[in-house]
């Protein structure tokens, strides 16, 4: 199976664009106790960095992008980023050169799905360890 590339831009340019993203409005919404999650500034900042790291991993390891897993709060950050569709589309265009679709893993409850999730989790740990020597 051939995996669609997320971008044709040079990796270093995409990573620089990811790091330059202004996600202040995303964090503000997530810090709002009524509209968001009531996160602290410190926690929102840490999840913003984790989100940018996740996007970087997708670009650096495009051949595995469909299998790289993300933490629940990073996924929540991504969902909140997507809510402002115009800004998200703009951010995707300047960062990746195209729209980055969110395709959540669908749970079927089958043994095959559990095995695939387990393999994806192992791959994610391996790639993060390779990248960050953790």
What annotation goes with each model-predicted range?
Residues 1-134:
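Intrinsically disordered, low-complexity, repeat-rich regions
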């Amino acid at each position: 199976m051939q995996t669609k590339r997320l971008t044709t831009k040079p990796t270093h340019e995409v990573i620089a664009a990811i790091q330059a993203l202004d996600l202040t409005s995303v964090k503000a919404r997530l810090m709002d106790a009524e509209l968001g999650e009531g996160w602290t500034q410190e926690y929102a900042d840490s999840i913003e960095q984790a989100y940018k790291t996740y996007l970087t991993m997708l670009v650096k390891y495009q051949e595995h992008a469909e299998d790289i897993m993300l933490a629940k709060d990073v996924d929540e950050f991504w969902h909140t980023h997507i809510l402002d569709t115009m800004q998200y589309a703009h951010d995707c265009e300047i960062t990746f050169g195209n729209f980055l679709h969110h395709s959540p893993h669908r749970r079927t409850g089958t043994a095959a799905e559990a095995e695939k999730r387990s393999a994806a989790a192992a791959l994610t740990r391996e790639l993060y360890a390779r990248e960050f020597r953790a």
